[in-house]
Amino acid sequence: MNQVRKWNIIGGRVIKTGIAVFLTVLVCEFFNIPTIFAVITAIVTIEPTATDSIKKGLVRFPASTIGSAYAMTFTFFLGHQALSYALAAMFTIVTCQKLRLHAGTLVATLTAVAMIPITADHYFTAFLIRLATTSTGIIVSTVVNFFILPPHYVKTISGCTEELFVKTANVMEEWLTALMDGKVIKKETTYNLSKLTVLLHKAVQFVQYEQKDWKYHRHTKKEMRSFLLVQKQLHLLQQIIYHIDNLARAPIETCDWSQNEKEILRRTIHSIISILRNYCEKIDEEHFKLIDELDKQFWTNKNDLAHCKPNQYHHHFSSESIILFEVLSIHDMLEELKQIFEKYESENQLNCSVH
């Protein structure tokens, strides 16, 4: 994973931006129209997905039209004054926001203020030329984004998912160390947990990108199954990270475990860490035995707490019960992850035997 990041200096989106700019300039030169506005539009129209390029392109065109119209109107009445720039920018922003052309506001405003100093006369002609250049930039960028190196995020999503499994296990290991020492978790562990959440959100965003362009590309059944697998894995990993976050907030220092209880918990969490590092492909019988022991321990803690008088203890759960509940909840997620992986493998084998 790290090797891929090391050598992937120029991404597909950067290459496509360069190609879009190059082709836009060629088209503008062929039709003998100014290039600068077309190039600006082409650069900002390259989006993470082809769908976004089309949708935002349809927003940016009317937005740029509004910006050009305001620029020419204020220049005609006020000339090349500071007030012309200010009014053109302000009116463009307000109009775009009122018409909900949010994706085109920046390009429209840049177009408006950039047109003023280079237009001395023939305002209506200049306005029409801006429409032509804006259209050129949008069309070229959309075509490039659609046909040249079309966005595919499946491999990236799979890589992020694998990384999430490993880093989730690492954070659990750090938390276990704090638990065994009976100390508050370190700031480093909290930081790693927040980074884990960021990585999860990044992976989910890539899934959304892939879904947007799914209808535009052909996929084999195996690719579709693989994509559905990582989607489900991410959903369950999100829940696991939520439970780990709860563990990180649990008051470890107030826990009072017996030596046997502590040992069972330690072995169970070690088993969970091992399962996560193997991407939940297998759960052995020893792990289930540990979970049974932990489950008994949880209900014993809960029943003991029920006998406490209100003036002795006013919470529904003790620190020990909270930790046991979260660990057992994580185990439930691991079982689900194992089941969906087994289903994925069996479907692949069935598909291979049919062919």
Swiss-Prot record:
Q: Which residues cross the membrane?
A: 19-39, 74-94, 109-129, 131-151
Where is the protein localized? Cell membrane
Chief location bin: membrane
The chain's disulfide connectivity reads none
Q: Which InterPro entries match?
A: ArAE_1
Instruction: State the UniProt keywords alphabetically.
Output: Cell membrane, Membrane, Transmembrane, Transmembrane helix
Coiled coil recorded as keyword: no
Look up and give the membrane topology term.
Multi-pass membrane protein
Q: Which family does it belong to?
A: Belongs to the UPF0421 family.
Protein's name in the database: UPF0421 protein BALH_2468
Lineage of producing organism: Bacteria, Bacillati, Bacillota, Bacilli, Bacillales
